[in-house]
């Protein structure tokens, strides 16, 4: 038995932990057809936004997705605070129905019924932001 723990072993151990102990679905990043300039798993995210926010119009869901993809202002700490607020409290959006403006919250997580959420662990998820980035694990 080797005394060395290589990176792939570590990565696989983490994936197994999330799959077997926590019930996450596993996806291998290179197998997913997507926009490499966006770090989000947009297909699953969009489906989840519609599922968790039934009855909201497309414009509300699309604005929430836009806000998730474009909060560029501020330093990393500020961006993390904004994202954490979105996770905990939802994303405030405005939309029009019949020429009248409405506002609501689009939720990213169902805290009351966890089975309504998607839990996915991915590895080798490459995205491009100034250069190629490939975190070992993304949740």
Task: Go through the PLM ranges and name each one.
Residues 1-139:
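An alpha-helical interface "stripe"
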């Amino acid at each position: 038995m080797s005394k060395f723990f290589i990176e792939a072993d570590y990565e696989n151990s983490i994936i197994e932990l999330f799959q077997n102990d926590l019930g996450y679905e596993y996806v291998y990043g290179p197998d997913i057809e997507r926009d490499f300039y966006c770090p989000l798993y947009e297909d699953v995210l969009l489906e989840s936004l519609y599922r968790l926010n039934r009855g909201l119009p497309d414009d509300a869901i699309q604005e929430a997705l836009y806000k998730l993809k474009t909060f560029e202002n501020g330093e990393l700490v500020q961006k993390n605070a904004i994202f954490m607020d979105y996770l905990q409290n939802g994303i405030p959006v405005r939309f029009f129905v019949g020429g009248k403006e409405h506002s609501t919250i689009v939720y990213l997580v169902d805290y009351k019924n966890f089975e309504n959420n998607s839990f996915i662990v991915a590895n080798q998820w490459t995205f491009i932001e100034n250069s190629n980035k490939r975190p070992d694990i993304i949740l």
